[in-house]
Amino acid sequence: MSKVKAEYIWIDGYSPTANLRSKTMIVDGPVNELNDLPEWGFDGSSTEQAAGDNSDCALKPVYYVPDPIRRKDHLLVMCEVLNADNTVHKSNTRAACVDLATKHKDHESWFGIEQEYTFYNGENPLGFPDEGYPAPQGEYYCGVGANNIYGREIVE
């Protein structure tokens, strides 16, 4: 039986911007299914998920993938956060999403991701004039062509 490093990963309770947290459990391998990964506890008072006098929270594995850094049989384990009584923690927004997806499983989900970023040339965004601002975005929003879009060679 091999030993597997399972990196349990969860979202903390900080607001307005939550952070990722993780800790490693050594489990007997190989891990063949989600049920091979046990629930695990953590101190929620250190992650803004519980008060200091009642700080127990639980990590419930919901998905795992091979660990690209440690390799071999080691894993990254995505977890939901539960209260000590196994109810859904208020910071666990995934649980509500799963409930909605289950309730509306007969409908097709559509979503889009728009990755926004800005390249800089010195103190100005790439392609901006040295003084002031460019013309209104109409010409270059979702634009095509070297006269409208800058930095394409980096993006591609």
Predicted regions and their residues:
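Glycine-rich, acidic/polar active-site loops that bind/position phosphate-bearing ligands
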Residues: 1-156
